[in-house]
From Swiss-Prot:
Functional note: Catalyzes the condensation of ATP and 5-phosphoribose 1-diphosphate to form N'-(5'-phosphoribosyl)-ATP (PR-ATP). Has a crucial role in the pathway because the rate of histidine biosynthesis seems to be controlled primarily by regulation of HisG enzymatic activity.
Classification via HAMAP family: HisG_Short
The record's note on its domains: Lacks the C-terminal regulatory region which is replaced by HisZ.
Subcellular location: Cytoplasm
Official protein name in the record: ATP phosphoribosyltransferase
Subunit annotation: Heteromultimer composed of HisG and HisZ subunits.
Length: 220
């Protein structure tokens, strides 16, 4: 086998997931030698010549892993629900990047009354599939509008009655005069593995997966 076929590729997104994955990698004896926040490189080397990290958009991590461009990756439950999880093995909830997915509205909007009266609500979200399933299960009539950022703006400019988005501290909602009215689910990030890689590269992958699992349990 060539060096390239022996090499393991880990897909990560910049920001919180990357930062919170670093201690898990270090528990497996792997250190990333470059910082994606200061480097323009999208392929980062590690102290292990057989492990590299690729930096992709958070929503693209499952796709890279599904099609084998990455052997494994770390993605939020929110992203995996939208992706569908096809072709992925999800062995470990890493208990990192914890937050929640919630419904929020402009302060002063009576969400409960609108729902009880059967009003049709306009909702902006990046998580269309998850939002659709949530509102359908509750019997709430909604028109969903997909946005890719700045969800909080929707209710402020009359684009929507509500948003479905991730909430951590709630400070962004408060700064934009929005209030959380419904908690849909808790979100954390999970390890995802390409099913073919798990078979073909099990000997190299297994120790890393076990180290991740032990480290995530210690931090939970």
């Amino acid at each position: 086998m060539t060096q390239e076929t022996q090499q393991l590729t880990l897909a990560l997104s910049k920001g919180r997931i990357f930062e919170e994955t670093l201690p898990l990698l270090e528990a497996a004896g792997i250190k990333v030698t470059e910082d994606p926040e200061t480097s323009r490189k999208l392929i980062l080397q590690t102290n292990d010549a057989n492990v590299r990290v690729i930096i992709v958009r958070a929503s693209d991590v499952p796709t890279y892993v599904q099609y084998g461009a990455a052997d494994f990756g770390v993605a939020g439950k929110d992203v995996l629900l939208e992706h569908g999880g096809e072709g992925l093995y999800q062995p470990i909830d890493l208990n990192i990047a914890n937050c929640r997915m919630s419904v929020a509205v402009k302060d002063g909007f009576d969400y409960e009354s609108a729902v009880q009266q059967g009003a049709r609500l306009r909702v902006v979200t990046k998580y269309v599939q998850t939002a659709r399933e949530h509102f359908a299960a509750k019997g709430v009539h909604v028109d969903l509008i997909k946005l890719y950022g700045s969800m909080e703006l929707g209710p402020l400019v009359g684009l929507a009655d509500a948003i479905v988005d991730l909430v951590s501290t709630g400070s962004t909602l408060r700064a934009n005069h929005l209030v959380e009215v419904e908690r849909i689910m808790d979100i954390s990030s999970r390890l995802v593995v390409n099913k073919a890689a798990l078979k073909l590269k099990r000997e190299r992958l297994q120790p890393i997966l076990e180290a991740f699992e032990k480290a995530s349990k210690r931090s939970s």
